Amino acid sequence: MYDRSIAIVGSGISGLSAAWHLSGNNKIFLFEKGDRLGGHTHTHVFNTERKPFFVDSGFIVFNKVNYPNFTNWIRELNVRESQSEMSFSVSRAGGDFEWG
């Protein structure tokens, strides 16, 4: 028997985190309008003649100092973390506007 039935709308990081943390003795109903979980976070695959390139979008920044609760959660899930450089650039209007 469950303590409660809980509805969660959206499967972005907040919805997935809420579902995981509340799932103990509760029955969770996760509602997502899209055809996949993850909200804005997604891995895009760009196939080239040589090899595919994988570009992650949506997950803008992660550092242990500013996100201690998130850090603890991914460690509890045994998710590996790796060091990376953070960069951002934009090219629009055929190169008329570029930043980065």
Which positions does each model-derived feature cover?
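Beta1/beta-strand and adjacent pyrophosphate-binding region of the FAD-binding site
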Residues: M1-S14, F29
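A short, Lys/Arg-enriched amphipathic alpha-helix followed by its capping loop at the start of a domain
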Residues: I6, S17-I28, E76
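Glycine-rich FAD pyrophosphate-binding loop
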Residues: V9, S23-T48
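Hydrophobic pocket-lining residues within nucleotide cofactor-binding pockets
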Residues: I13, R36-L37, F62
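Short, flexible micro-motifs
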Residues: I13-A18, T41-H42
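A generic local structural motif
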Residues: G15-L16, N47-E49
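Dinucleotide-binding Rossmann-like beta1-alpha1 core, especially the glycine-rich loop
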Residues: E49-G100
